[in-house]
């Protein structure tokens, strides 16, 4: 995290700019082109509906952490934000656990379990997550007979940490607040029923 801003001013600023740039891409997606000439009513309506759906997605991120994690765009935006705080390993571990649970092969399960442990859980791991010693040892024990639930405790604690710590800061960040404001304007720019047809002047 950017605790020592005086030591890493350029890096922190660069990551903050990267976050704003990535969210800027989402902003661009959420805007209708001002040039609607030459497209059919069906194409315009489809684009309008997708744009409204994206705006609703963005606004949903502030409703609950679950909605954020269930949104691909939300995860991407949150990950970009976490990179500015040098804490992206928490989300990456959570995502790795979600993918891990989908594995059905016992051989692959054991192999992947050890890989995740070495990457995120063991002491001095390259992307070591912030969990207590007891949870680390419990997870290590679980690897002796790996199942899809062997990371559940560690994943749960990491999720709680993100929800209580990083998530509120994400919602208060200027980049997300700008994005949410744009989404709010977009979602109220037309009646909730059928979208108005584009004008062809």
From Swiss-Prot:
Expression sites by tissue: Retinal; also predominantly expressed in the liver and pituitary.
UniProt entry keywords in alphabetical sequence: GTPase activation, Lipoprotein, Membrane, Palmitate, Phosphoprotein, Signal transduction inhibitor
Modified residues (Phosphotyrosine): 167, 176
Chief localization: membrane
Disordered: region residues: 181-201
Task of the protein: Regulates G protein-coupled receptor signaling cascades. Inhibits signal transduction by increasing the GTPase activity of G protein alpha subunits, thereby driving them into their inactive GDP-bound form. Plays an important role in the phototransduction cascade by regulating the lifetime and effective concentration of activated transducin alpha. May regulate extra and intracellular mitogenic signals.
Name of the protein in its database record: Regulator of G-protein signaling 16
Annotated organism of origin: Mus musculus (Mouse)
Classification lineage: Eukaryota, Metazoa, Chordata, Craniata, Vertebrata
Gene behind the chain: Rgs16
